[in-house]
């Protein structure tokens, strides 16, 4: 009998949400995603020490300024981990721009190009890389420009429909709407504490975005992210891609039985609305208290982990 992970792969591209190379070898995903928190966790793994040492040595060759060395080594470490992962996945690696740049379009573009150059210098072409940016108005504008220059982007920390619409209209390659973090907010801020998978607010959000994109002929890939249980994952079978943490990949691989496709669109493609303006985007996003809270919290958390990573690097310089 087939297992649920194998069955899921019939309908959806499975991506590993981890920086752990051992997990890549075990579950053989198509792509992999990383973020500052995952890079920080990966940096604690003994096998990665050589990647850290290489990043530090490289940074020392680039500059004599300690602050610049820390920035350079942190960028190089993220790319070094990405390079190791790319040896194991046939598709793409997502590497994230510093979350502290989430409200600065030009700085985000510059950092993205810096990461791309590090990959290119290591022999990796742009078609194997996704640059991750937070789905702020400024991040979406940065992605729009990068896409025009042949740098594909993964827009993350996406919680509102306004964010999803703006990303599609900007022509970004891929979005990562968060499922589990939406569920977390509703459990913490409403009286309802238990949700069946089909009524899980995170699942409902991703389903609505998927239908809207297909209905209007947008090519932006929808990749559900941030799962709390396999029930959420199974309800999104058929989504373009799902990025899944190793613990849930393990649970799916160990669960027997075929699964059914839940997301699909066979209707006609409808005319697209006029592009959302900045003021419309900000107002519509602001009308969703969950999205406002979780976007801000997500940026803060990634920034904290970026700073922890920089402190760890600084101690080695």
From Swiss-Prot:
Pfam families from the UniProt entry: TAL_FSA
Catalytic site positions: 132
Biological process according to GO: carbohydrate metabolic process; pentose-phosphate shunt
Main location: cytoplasm
One Gene Ontology MF term: transaldolase activity
Matches recorded under HAMAP family: Transaldolase_1
Protein name: Transaldolase B
Disulfide bonds: none
Catalyzed reaction equations: D-sedoheptulose 7-phosphate + D-glyceraldehyde 3-phosphate = D-erythrose 4-phosphate + beta-D-fructose 6-phosphate
EC number: 2.2.1.2
Entries under InterPro entries matching the protein: Aldolase_TIM (IPR013785), TAL/FSA (IPR001585), Transaldolase_1 (IPR004730), Transaldolase_AS (IPR018225)
Recorded metabolic or biological pathway in which this protein acts: Carbohydrate degradation; pentose phosphate pathway; D-glyceraldehyde 3-phosphate and beta-D-fructose 6-phosphate from D-ribose 5-phosphate and D-xylulose 5-phosphate (non-oxidative stage): step 2/3
High-level lineage: Bacteria, Pseudomonadati, Pseudomonadota, Gammaproteobacteria, Enterobacterales
Family membership noted in the UniProt record: Belongs to the transaldolase family. Type 1 subfamily.
Protein's job: Transaldolase is important for the balance of metabolites in the pentose-phosphate pathway.
Keyword entries, A-Z: Cytoplasm, Pentose shunt, Schiff base, Transferase
EC category name: transferase
Subunit relationships: Homodimer.
Top-level taxonomic group: Bacteria
Location in the cell: Cytoplasm
GO CC annotation: cytosol
Organism name: Escherichia coli O6:H1 (strain CFT073 / ATCC 700928 / UPEC)
């Amino acid at each position: 009998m087939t297992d649920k992970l194998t069955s899921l792969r019939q309908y959806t591209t499975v991506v590993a949400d981890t920086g752990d190379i051992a997990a890549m070898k075990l579950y053989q995903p198509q792509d992999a995603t990383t973020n500052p928190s995952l890079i920080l966790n990966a940096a604690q793994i003994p096998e990665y020490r050589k990647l850290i040492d290489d990043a530090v040595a490289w940074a020392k060759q680039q500059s004599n300024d300690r602050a610049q060395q820390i920035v350079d080594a942190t960028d190089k470490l993220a790319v070094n981990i990405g390079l190791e992962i790319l040896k194991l996945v046939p598709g793409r690696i997502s590497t994230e721009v510093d979350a502290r740049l989430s409200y600065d379009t030009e700085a985000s573009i510059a950092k993205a190009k810096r990461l791309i150059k590090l990959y290119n210098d290591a022999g990796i072409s742009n078609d194997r890389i996704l640059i991750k940016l937070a789905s702020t108005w400024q991040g979406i504008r940065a992605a729009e420009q990068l896409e025009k220059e042949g740098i594909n982007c993964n827009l993350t920390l996406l919680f509102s429909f306004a964010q999803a619409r703006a990303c599609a209209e900007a022509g970004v390659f891929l979005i990562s709407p968060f499922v589990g973090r939406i569920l977390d907010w509703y459990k913490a801020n409403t009286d309802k504490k238990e949700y069946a998978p089909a009524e899980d607010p995170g699942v409902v959000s991703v389903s609505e975005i998927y239908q809207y994109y297909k209905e209007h002929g947008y090519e932006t890939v929808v990749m559900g992210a941030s799962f709390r249980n396999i029930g959420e994952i199974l309800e999104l079978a058929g989504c373009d891609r799902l990025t899944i943490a190793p613990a849930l990949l393990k649970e799916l691989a160990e669960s027997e039985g075929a699964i059914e496709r839940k997301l699909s669109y066979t209707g006609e493609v409808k005319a697209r609305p006029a592009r959302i303006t900045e003021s419309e985007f900000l107002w519509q996003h602001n009308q969703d208290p969950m999205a406002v809270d979780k976007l801000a919290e997500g940026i803060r958390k990634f920034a904290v982990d970026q700073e922890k990573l920089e402190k760890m690097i600084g101690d080695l310089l």
